[in-house]
């Protein structure tokens, strides 16, 4: 077993086994060693070919030129694996042949590279960081711009499994906050099975479909104009007639090839369909949910967990994306097979990707934050095992069908935030979602009216949570087009409040109105757009206390202010200005007057690691605990309490401001 730890020295540790029956290989020409067409296979000796005949292809990472091979007749001792490695490493055409890790639950292969993600504390200077990396023999490939003192580094060739020991030793360095090897897994898009009933009430084949998201009605108020939706996927046919309008395409990028041309590969149909669902113009054959939005196509076909993955979010944020749609994630289990081990595998979110998402959320839209959505998944399994879709700062989108109930494959769990219409398989009233397809007969539709249109420019059978996610992303764009001043979490809250509670019997909604299958329900686009504009302004009073109160190690400091108003509270915002050199040491609480009968409300709970200072406004969306103060009389003494829970760093409370609406 080897171990990897995400979240720093105190983060969760994940165990990975060394496979006895897999090898990973890369050829000099990037050609495959195993092919259905022998003349296309990489040239190797007869001895190597004989050993390869005992293996079969497990998975291929095409862009890296790497493939994972599996022994046809598995053993327990790894003898054939080791013999194959020895023979193949002597072949001139073979760049390397190495061991492979497997997830002990799902038995899925995981490839480790000789690269590491390393993040030092905020206070360390560059020369010190470089000195530490040099001490471990590491070469800096890139200093990462999305997190302070973060590096993508490589170990010397043939480091092999020792890369895990290096990562653990680095984590024991006092100056290192985060460190993990670059682990890559099979990357799967969120698609399942095979006219735009999801946008409005529609009659198809004599059947009236009413299971829509009320999108067409929302267009009277907003069509997405002024917003940009980033589609991170396998590329987009940017020459498609529904994307050809002037200025439609913004900042295209291929993070895998490192070019600005996100052209799909020969079999890459997924991204074009997703883009069509989100923001197709609707001028020729299919409208997106937000037809007025601009499209930022980002092609990402590298492996799950790679540095390219993190780069996708940074590119989107730096180039003006408002909304980021991700219809991909870890491999799903077979939705109808409850014995599939993939159902139980837990795939963590790498720190490198998490920090890139945080960068988009904290820095995107001039600090208001990009809205990030993920497809919940198509395995009929728990989304909570998927570290990507279950990350607390993203919106996980489930799928509901044309009957207004759960799509059979759709993942479920506590992380599901909302649902959007998609296909179902059987039974179904429609083939699926009608959307843009790669132009001509090269996409999902080979040129048949049974599959879409005769020209092959549109498909009628897109589906899965792959389709639900960009649909919800389009609604987020409608919201921001109506009110561009909203923060990312306010958009998420509006989506929550807009949802229609479908399937009341089968939805298993709890007391808070949340379902494991639909989250808060099926998005209602019209309601969401109506909620985007604030209600009529209410009388507001602002109360401020300014005083430099020292924050000493392992002590608690307080700053108080008195409020005399006796009107019931309708809304509240709390702004704090705290200077400190390591905010991960701090717990910050607001203590209302005792007469309110409300317990202290935690505003900040040791998050942020070694970052400096807390200058932030908290409201009922970002801090739901503040809702307990609605209807209370504010008269009395309010106290900001700051508890320092670790040694070495100090600071001071500068000010406290409380804004009350009456």
Curated annotation (Swiss-Prot):
CDD domains xref list: Peptidases_S8_15
Chain ranges of the Peptidase S8 domain: 196-529
Subcellular location: Cytoplasm
A single MF term (Gene Ontology): serine-type endopeptidase activity
Enzyme Commission number, as recorded: 3.4.21.-
Domain P/Homo B: from-to ranges: 535-662
Keywords recorded for this protein, A-Z: Calcium, Cytoplasm, Hydrolase, Protease, Serine protease, Zymogen
Entry's Gene Ontology cellular component terms: cytoplasm; endomembrane system; intracellular membrane-bounded organelle; membrane
Alphabetical list of Pfam families matching this protein: P_proprotein (PF01483), Peptidase_S8 (PF00082)
UniProt-listed InterPro entries: Galactose-bd-like_sf, P_dom, Pep_S8_PrcA, Peptidase_S8/S53_dom, Peptidase_S8/S53_dom_sf, Peptidase_S8_Asp-AS, Peptidase_S8_His-AS, Peptidase_S8_Ser-AS
Major enzyme class: hydrolase
Physiological role: Degrades phycobiliproteins in vitro. Has a substrate specificity similar to that of trypsin.
Entry-linked PANTHER family: NEUROENDOCRINE CONVERTASE 1, PROPROTEIN CONVERTASE SUBTILISIN/KEXIN-RELATED
Family per record: Belongs to the peptidase S8 family.
Entry protein name: Calcium-dependent protease
